[in-house]
Amino acid sequence: MRLTKTLLISAVLLMSATGMQAAGFNQNGNYLTVQLKQHQNFGPSQIRLQVVSDKIIRVQATAEQSFRNKQSLIIVPQNSKAKYKVEEQGDNLIITTAAMRAVMNEATGQITFYDLKDNVLLNEVAQGGKTFKPFTVPDREIGVDIAKVPEAQKHGWSWRALFNSPDNEAFYGLGQHQSEELNMKGKNEDLFQYNTKVSVPFVISNKNYGILWDSYSYCRWGNPEDYLQLNRAFKLYDKDGKEGQLTGTYVDKNGKKIVRGEDSIYFEYAMPEASEICNKTDKGGIQNLPKGFALNGSKVVYEGYVEAPTNSFYQFILYYAGYMKIYIDGKLVVPERWRTAWNPNSYKFETPIKKGVKTPIRIEWQPDGDVSYCGLRVAAPRSEAEKNQLSIWSEMSPDMDYYFIAGQNLDEVISGYRTLTGKASLYPKWTLGFWQSRERYQSSKDIEDNMKKFRDLHIPVDNIVQDWNYWKLDSWGSHEFEAARYPNPQAMLDSVHAMNGRFMISVWPKFYDTVKNYKELDSKGWMYHQAIKDDIHDWLGFRGSFYDAYSDGARKMFWRQMDENLYTKYKFGIDAWWMDASEPNVRDCTPMWYRKALSGPTALGTSTEYFNAYSIVNADAIYNGQRSVNPNQRVFLLTRSGFAGEQRYSTATWSGDIATRWEDMRAQMTAGLNYSMAGLPFWGMDQGGFCVENRYVAAQQEFDKTGKENADLKEWRELQARWNQFGCFVPLYRTHGQWPTREVWNIAPADHPAYKTIVAYDKLRYRLMPYLYSMAGMVHFKDYTMMRGLVMDFNGDDNVYDIKDQWMFGPALMACPIGEYQKYSRNVYLPKQKGWYDFYTGKHYAGGQTIVADAPFDKIPVFVPEGSILPVGPEMEWSDQKKAELIDLYVYAGKDGSYTLYEDEGTNYNYEKGKYAMIDFKYNDAQKTVTIAARKGAFDGMLQKRRFNIVLVSDNNQQGISLAKAPKGKMVKYAGKAVTVKLK
């Protein structure tokens, strides 16, 4: 290679250098900017590269004459010390770091990333890898306060980044979505925030890289175009074969029938009747259902034929509330699904349809409420080559801005993501215990009585949660307890704490317009006004709106109001904050354009540009607010939405108001895995589901009257049992839902197998506390991921890339839940890199095979890989009831292994000052020795002496983990000095 220009540059030198002009690029500080020699239509005019570290390169592109320098909401300040080399050869600009190389064609702008062995990691397509279209925000999306928006903020760019991707590539991340998809290769995903849907602009590849794009608008992964109405994608025929539309048959509960033609199935939203802007600009949604037809209890069928323009696997998206089934070509392509009427769900599916053939279609819908929703759309067909590409589209940004992150493995890639967006906080230890929640405790007596019952029954629990409406009915946003139901909140908090419990409270960014806090925020221009203008009343009958969390002043005021009414007022007795509806969800079931009008304009720009990032700025308000008034108590937030960078604000996300259905349970497995692999480490769900089918409600009511367990109640109890077993192996172990309430004694009697297994897994969770809290330490100090798709630990085994219902929970436990009713065994794939042990029995299996694992009612399969070291602590009823003076240390033979036990004070920030301890363990399989290293570090209250009962699990010593009996092992006394133990 003949080099025409070579520069050895360190970031320190770059910072002092300005305006250096090379043959094809300009170097200013640590930026390398290229003015493209061939400016293609809709392409960039300039590209700017920044070496952030050896493994991270930032790519910016603009279609304008210069870059707009916006302040990032997700990237923390970077102090790069990376050294790199810049070369030019012909039209190529080459940047080489200690870990990788980026090559940009200065004529076309195409960028290719290589490792140092010249293997391509990722490359943009040669033509059209970066495209732009000018974008102007429609007036209706800005809404009533359009006069506040400067003209420049109304204009930006829609952009698309397009990359080649080999057939054997797999993609993960993008946040939490509900279609039971894990590997996103060839899939489409609309990226926006919604109750049960959390979108994160970060994706990782099994090729050991990730892409983080710095955009806050609505985005699309995969197909950059919107889904089509059925009549735009197909020729439609009614059930009699007449061209033009499908047949819609509506039969109400009294037998009244309406039959009409339907050229599309798009009844996906409702509009407020008093909204002038809606009435003028949007005639769609449920207002196009038959006039006067009573949906509740009805049955609706859409049927006929579709004729496709080309042979393809067509990618559909179903939007549904109530019960839904879909048949295409005589096949059941969507088995029955259900969602409550006020919170519809989206579900994606694919099916082949042949060109030019009238293919039968039948959609069966049973609405479940007076208002309900239904929609079916389809993506325009694309070739397999197009589907296989990596495509990212952003609706509105000032420019294209993405970070390429390389690593030796996916942990390193996620570490790079956290280098950019901030380290994860170390959560309070008690958050890893069991949380009891419901919608909702109605009084302080409810709270205290239920906490006391846990203690009386000796069932482990750490946290009890107060959901919404603890305030007076007409005072949402006051943050004040209603005195009649909560006469002495301080006494309630003191009582919970005296029982060694913790207390979390729900706070929404929502305010009725009559409360003092609304008026104070509004006086500064910090409330969204569209909902007030349109006279939107919530389900309780009152009018209100949300505050503008994008304003620094608004965030400080919001926290001050919380502090004055809840936190300092009650002597810091509230342990955690439940930040609900942080999408923000001003009104359910509205079209996207109106959601934007309801949640803007923001202090930073239009809500179109800042549509997805509300939750991170809202989390900023609470995290920094609490630390400003009580700097040494760990903050913890639970939020219904999330975004890149939120981990730095001690925030966990739960998956929203999901349904109590087996398919929803299964969907949470992939939802949690992809959320975790999007770099956000702490996730949970409403164990047991939130929204309850009427059949389960009726079954519980019958049991309460008669004591009889009918078929529906039997299924309900098994669903709750399986979901709680599943929940034991996710970061946040929390039950929550609507009636029937979810305290274990309300799910089933104490002699019922559902009760017994729920309590057993609760106790197991607490026995695993040394393992769990050490994982939390790894998350903070080593950028670890707790809930891990198998690709993270067994990349290279092609069989793991699409496994949706198995994962590693930390380094030692592979959870394999049951997601179907009356299923008492399941296939389990054991990755080939290691052998495996049954967690309960110690039986050994070779890797690289699929086995049929027993899964009786009271257990789900769990397996442990060879080389694992698993600490198991004492039985406890709350997380810090006992210090782990005796730890059963299970060591699994077959591979060398290592593990680090992490401990600190658990609730404060002294770990930031170095007050913590780590003990390293190493297992040598050939010698059958365990070396316990000298303890590193110290903290107040640390155990100076302890015991380890070291249990070697092997083919010859099959020992499982049991709550009933202590394992046989070798007892070692440890006082902080290194010791090596021979196990055989």
Predicted stretch roles:
Residues 623-635, 642-654, 675-685, 690-929, ...:
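Catalytic core of carbohydrate-active enzymes
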Residues 1-26:
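Bacterial Sec-dependent N-terminal signal peptides
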Residues 69-85, 328-348, 529-530, 534, ...:
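Solvent-exposed beta-strand/loop surfaces of large extracellular or lumenal domains
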Residues 25, 29, 48-92, 133:
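A low-complexity, Ser/Thr/Gly/Pro-enriched, surface-exposed linker/loop concept
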